[in-house]
Amino acid sequence: CQSELMPRILEANRNELFDKSIYQEMGSLGFLGAPIKGYGCAGVNYVSYGLIAREIERVDSSYRSAFSVQTSLAKQAIDKFGSEEQKEYFLPEMAKGNLIGCFGLTEPDAGSDPGSMKTNCKETEGGYLLNGSKTWITNSPIADVLIIWAKDEQGILSCLLYTSDAADD
């Protein structure tokens, strides 16, 4: 990480940009989604995943955060709660770094407590209407896949998966 990652991250930071090619390189090395089995993911244990995160963190915390959100939050949500069709579509492309995920749980008045969350969703023709506020969504400015937590009309916690194209609608 010191020799390969550091110079590129310094350049990206100087230019105030997120270098997606670094993310894709992480994917080509099997880092993104490392502990997930199948779907193009490496399927390594959590100690190995932690060591990868530690080495990235030694160079830059923001890229380590982006790596961790992709793997531990966005991809894990799809792996645990997504349909087989969603897993087959999203997980391989996220593992390659071709799609970047984010995870929206934290709210201004509720923190990261799902029980206190105010964001709600209502099923509509062709999708959902989402109302509420989220904060600190790592990767959100560059995300292609958005995992957003909200309560449905019955107050049941729901995980909504949007693509960046759908979020613009």
PLM region descriptions:
Residues 44, 113-115, 139-143:
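Short glycine/proline-enriched turns and hinge-like loops at secondary-structure junctions
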Residues 53, 75-78, 91, 147:
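Conserved protein kinase catalytic domain
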